Amino acid sequence: MSDTWLDKVHWTPDGLVPVIAQEAGTNKVLMFAWMNRESLRLTAETGQAVYWSRSRNRLWHKGEESGHVQKVHEIRLDCDEDVILILVEQVGGIACHTGRHNCFFQKLEQDGWVTDQAIIKNPEDIYHHE
């Protein structure tokens, strides 16, 4: 497969594109992340989500530490060609590093943020940093 399809993406000045991961089947939004050209190409090639970690300044294969990989069903480009949507199967049911199903577990109610999603698994049990 040629890489010319990557040229259609409108990358940010620093070579990134915002990505929304959505759960295939339920259409629930799981998380937001960034991809660079290489991570988007790897995602398409491997069928598993590979992001660009801005904090670690490196490729981040989703689930590389936790085992909670995202199997990609579909990759879509928005109408302005500057946002990617990936439909994924979330292995293990946990997309968020906090141990929750998705990263959008805080809801604005009145004048404050309320957590409305339980922790499925303690992050200390997921990430074994030594």
UniProtKB/Swiss-Prot annotation:
Zinc keyword on record: yes
EC number: 3.5.4.19
Gene Ontology CC: cytoplasm
Binding site for Zn(2+): 79, 96, 103
Signal sequence extent: none
Cofactor: Mg(2+); Zn(2+)
Details of cofactor binding: Binds 1 Mg(2+) ion per subunit.
InterPro entries xref list: PRA-CH, PRib_AMP_CycHydrolase_dom, PRib_AMP_CycHydrolase_sf
Catalysed reactions, as listed in the record: 1-(5-phospho-beta-D-ribosyl)-5'-AMP + H2O = 1-(5-phospho-beta-D-ribosyl)-5-[(5-phospho-beta-D-ribosylamino)methylideneamino]imidazole-4-carboxamide
UniProt cross-references to SUPFAM superfamilies, sorted A to Z: HisI-like
Gene Ontology terms for molecular function: magnesium ion binding; phosphoribosyl-AMP cyclohydrolase activity; zinc ion binding
Enzyme class: hydrolase
Annotated pathway: Amino-acid biosynthesis; L-histidine biosynthesis; L-histidine from 5-phospho-alpha-D-ribose 1-diphosphate: step 3/9
Places the protein is found: Cytoplasm
Functional summary from the UniProt entry: Catalyzes the hydrolysis of the adenine ring of phosphoribosyl-AMP.
Subunit structure: Homodimer.
Protein's name according to its UniProt entry: Phosphoribosyl-AMP cyclohydrolase
